[in-house]
Amino acid sequence: MHAFSHSTTSTPTAVPVPPSLSLPVIEAAFPRQLHPYWPRLQEKTRTWLLEKRLMPADKVEEYADGLCYTDLMAGYYIGAPDEVLQAIADYSAWFFVWDDRHDRDIVHYRPAAWRRLRFRLHAALDAPKEHLHHGDPLVAGFADSMVRLYSFMPRTWNMRFARHFHAVIEAYDREFRNRTEGIIPTVEEYLALRRLTFAHWIWTDLLEPSAELELPDGVRKHPAYRRAALLSQEFAAWYNDLCSLPKEIAGDEVHNLGISLIKHEGLTLEEAVTEIRRRVETCISGFLDAERLALEFADSLADGTVRGKEIAAAVRACVCNMRNWFSSVYWFHHESGRYMVDSWDDRSTPPYVNNEAAGEK
């Protein structure tokens, strides 16, 4: 269990947040939400991780619930049909496992293994049904996720999602090269790369099956909608950097906004933390303005036709869930075992990962 300290209401038991990471405006103005399907979601994602052999059974038993992967998604995609949320949650859990494999391939310097995985994921993204029984569980699990996600939406959405995720895979490859070669990107390079490695447009795309409607291009690309979507994702990425900075500096990392600020802008660690926090807080205030404009835009779409009413309702649902991302991400960073580095026996090796050379098979 987890999700709001064993509660399925939107009134969580407070988790202690370090003062340096505390954002009172999130705690006060962004109340947490939780999809009512969450208890089953957690159980079924745990089973899926086992069935797809994405984590060893002992690690699923000991760590899966405490990692709070399903809590994160169940606090975001409110209103999604149960089967859509289940597919998103399984895909999200897969994404974290993939991120861990990528990290281990870097730590153990396995470029050949990473290259094979990269090409296989590109292939599975374009033809998932052909990869459902692939020998690498990470490829097969990804294919399973994609078959399910693609089933909810029309071909145009599927093609857009695939295009966005091909770019994410290539961004992970750039991060692999940067980390193995010790290259610290400039601030602007990092910000552009982070939008891809954090998969900004993937999580934004998934708002649409949650709302049960593909948004027309003109709606999705409208400045009011796009700005609200971008700010919600930027907040998540930069807050993650703020929470991760001390451990990533200790681990000789090169991919963190703070590290780029220190290296290329000459900031001290304290100044870098202050600057990331400023950017995080600017995202919050910017979103509050963007949210208002996006909801006004939604209202303007209700033109008296059935189609207009449907699109307006879907945009409102998407914008409401952009708001939910703030609280879900914020509390995830203080509840998930993924960030409790001080409790690990070895700070360089997360206890929930398979540290073997999985990719060398």
Annotate each PLM feature.
Residues 1-361:
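Alpha-helical, largely C-terminal catalytic domains
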